[in-house]
From Swiss-Prot:
Signal peptide: none annotated. This is Translation machinery-associated protein 7 homolog. Residues 28-44 have a biased composition (Basic and acidic residues). Residues 21-50 form a coiled coil. InterPro entries: TMA7.
């Protein structure tokens, strides 16, 4: 006997999930989420164009 034969065998394909009945609230919520994700993505792209906010790195105090 090999070690892999024990237990329940996995099915080759997962069963397809049926269509969900979405209410108007669910549709609105999904639409709102997509719009927010789009805004966040645009803001991230816009922020990436400017470069780093801090440009000094480690600052030396000047004391010896």
């Amino acid at each position: 006997m090999s070690g892999r034969q024990g237990g329940k065998a996995k099915p080759l394909k997962a069963p397809k999930k049926g269509e969900k009945d979405l209410s108007e609230e669910d549709v609105e919520f999904k639409k709102k989420q997509q719009e927010e994700a789009k805004k966040i993505k645009e803001m991230a792209a816009k922020a990436g164009q400017r470069g780093p906010l801090l440009g000094g790195g480690i600052k030396k105090s000047g004391k010896k």
